[in-house]
From Swiss-Prot:
This is Protein phosphatase 1 regulatory inhibitor subunit 16B. Regulator of protein phosphatase 1 (PP1) that acts as a positive regulator of pulmonary endothelial cell (EC) barrier function. Protects the endothelial barrier from lipopolysaccharide (LPS)-induced vascular leakage. Involved in the regulation of the PI3K/AKT signaling pathway. Involved in the regulation of angiogenesis and endothelial cell proliferation through the control of ECE1 dephosphorylation, trafficking and activity. Involved in the regulation of endothelial cell filopodia extension. May be a downstream target for TGF-beta1 signaling cascade in endothelial cells. A lipid is attached at residue 565 (S-farnesyl cysteine). It is found in: Cell membrane; Nucleus; Cell projection. It is a lipid-anchor. PANTHER family: PROTEIN PHOSPHATASE 1 REGULATORY INHIBITOR SUBUNIT 16B, PROTEIN PHOSPHATASE 1 REGULATORY SUBUNIT 12. ANK repeats lie at residues 100-129, 133-162, 228-257, 261-290, 531-560. A lipid is attached at residue 564 (S-palmitoyl cysteine).
Length: 568
């Protein structure tokens, strides 16, 4: 049929033609319209018959439907016990799970739906079902602190030693004290010991080590990858299986293999916080600068600050070693022998071997220090023995030796310093006019009288010596420790060198032409002072000795006590 534009054009032309021609054109257009209408009616009847034929045959209707696992989980999430019971009666498995491995029993243990938990367990649900992270329903109930569900799960045989991917058991995750008491009571009732707990924790790693040994024996490639591109070293690194990783590294597996996301084993260890594993991988050449498909380095995947600090230290040490190797390159570095690089030897050593090596070094150092300390103690003991022998000799020596030949005072050197005496004396000594008091080593006071009681020639054999013999002192053996200390203090007082410097201070010059050969001694010695029966003498003309201050009593002082003066 002609279009509308064609009809308008034809009408303009028909106005100019005769009437007969316009009539013929109108009839022609009417015939075309009738033919078009007949065709439309025919098509309409055909569609009606076709629709009636479909209805008579009973065609299926389209509708929305869901998988049984989705429907069961959705009903459990809504706590719809009737619908769950309907699914279970229609032979729907209670162990159906979603893409995360989560079952209806997991979901009900999280939401504390006790009725549906009992319903699922009564229809044979697996009480130890594990999701993708190896969590069991008991893990979920213990973590949430649902003590009623924990009791039900234990009654149906829940595994108290089930270990998830993080190496945690249900009692490790439980923070609710009553729930934890129930779990520990059940563990004690089942006879679970710490040895069993440690054995169960190490079971996954031990199984992996066994599988690796089987692969080695069969000659299989240890760099085998799974559907996600992960190798055995990826798995060991993510789970922290140190022994399995050391076994793989000892057999030369690559540490730079990437999975489909561009992750190396070091990335996995960093993401899951396996610090020792990261140190092991770095020591075997893993790169701390490796990047994933998302342009992430291992340190970017860490969540713990302590782990980040460790990785930064490892990176710094690695950079220092590389710079030192580049700086100290020599002809020896081009050798192919094993002595070419010590860093390679350390890098290929296992963590346990290096720990044993450090322990041996510490033991050797401790032995060396013990030997050095023993030698120092021996030297000190020898030195102390010599000091004791010297002290014993000094104590046994007579502090007042007798002159074999009588010696007068005039025989001593006459050129001596000027003294502070009130009046000079010739060839002798005199006591000062004033009275002096001297503090001795035991706190007593020694008085020197103004007028001497007697005078005698120094060393005159005709006059009885006022000094008692040292043998008499030795015969008076000490009976107590106090007396022994006092005797030692008295002996050291006599042997102190300070006395010899004051001996001639009170002696005046004598005339060279003196006719007297006498050597009178005026107050040459004081009356004896005795601390424990032993006489001790002091020459009064030795000048004014300094006043020595000592602490009393003598028992509280050390043995190193010095007297105020000495007779030479």
């Amino acid at each position: 049929m002609a279009s509308h534009v064609d009809l308008l054009t034809e009408l303009q032309l028909l106005e100019k033609v005769p009437t007969l021609e316009r009539l013929r054109a109108a009839q022609k257009r009417r015939a075309q319209q009738l033919k078009k209408w007949a065709q439309y009616e025919q098509d309409l009847q055909h569609r009606k018959r076709k629709h009636e034929r479909k209805r008579s045959t009973g065609g299926r209707r389209k509708k929305v439907s869901f998988e049984a696992s989705v429907a069961l989980l959705e009903a459990s999430l809504r706590n719809d016990a009737e619908e769950v019971r309907y699914f279970l009666k229609n032979k729907v498995s209670p162990d159906l799970c979603n893409e995360d491995g989560l079952t209806a029993l997991h979901q009900c243990c999280i939401d504390n739906f006790e009725e549906i938990v009992k319903l699922l367990l009564s229809h044979g649900a697996n009480v130890n079902a594990k999701d993708n992270e190896l969590w069991t329903p008991l893990h979920a109930a213990a973590t949430c602190g649902h003590i009623n569900l924990v009791k039900i799960l234990v009654q149906y045989g829940a595994d108290l030693l089930a270990v998830n991917s993080d190496g945690n058991m249900p009692y490790d995750l439980c923070e609710d004290e009553p729930t934890l008491d129930v779990i520990e009571t059940c563990m004690a009732y089942q006879g679970i010991t710490q040895e069993k707990i440690n054995e169960m924790r190490a079971a996954p790693e031990q199984q992996m080590i066994s599988d690796i040994h089987c692969m080695i024996a069969a000659g299989q490639d240890l760099d085998w990858v799974d559907a996600q591109g992960a190798t055995l070293l990826h798995i060991a690194g993510a789970n922290g299986y140190l022994r399995a990783a050391e076994l793989l590294l000892d057999h030369g597996v690559r540490v730079d293999v990437k999975d489909w996301d561009g992750w190396e084993p070091l990335h996995a260890a960093a993401f899951w916080g396996q610090m020792q594993m990261a140190e092991l991988l770095v020591s075997h050449g893993a790169s701390l600068s490796a990047r994933t498909s998302m342009d992430e380095m291992p340190i970017d995947l860490c969540e713990e600050e302590e782990f980040k600090v460790l990785l930064l230290e490892l990176k710094h040490k690695h950079d220092v070693i590389m710079k030192s190797q580049l700086r100290h390159k020599s002809s020896l570095s081009r050798r192919t022998s094993s002595a070419g690089s010590r860093g390679k030897v350390v890098r290929r050593a296992s963590l346990s071997d290096r720990t044993n090596l450090y322990r041996k070094e510490y033991e050797g150092e401790a032995i060396l220090w013990q030997q050095r300390s023993a030698s120092e103690d021996q030297r000190n003991s020898t030195y102390n023995g010599d000091i004791r022998e010297t002290r014993t000799d000094q104590e046994n020596k007579d502090p007042n030796p007798r002159l074999e030949k009588p010696v007068l005072l005039s025989e001593f050197p006459t050129k001596i310093p000027h003294s502070d005496m009130d009046m000079p004396v010739e060839n002798g000594l005199r006591a000062p006019v004033s009275t002096y008091q001297y503090a001795l080593c035991n706190g007593d006071v020694w008085k020197v009288h103004e007028v001497p009681d007697y005078s005698m020639a120094y060393g005159n054999p005709g006059v009885a010596d006022a000094t008692p013999s040292w043998s008499g002192y030795k015969e008076q053996s000490p009976q107590t420790l106090l007396e022994l200390k006092r005797q030692r203090a008295a002996a050291k007082l006599l042997s102190h060198p300070f006395l010899s410097t004051h001996l001639g201070s009170g002696v005046s010059r004598t005339g060279e032409g003196s006719s007297e050969g006498k050597a009178p001694l005026i107050g040459g010695r004081t009356s004896p002072y005795s601390s424990n029966g032993t006489s001790v003498y002091y020459t009064v003309t030795s000048g004014d000795p300094p006043l020595l201050k000592f602490k009393a009593p003598i028992e509280e002082m050390e043995e190193k006590v010095h007297g105020c003066c000495r007779i030479s």
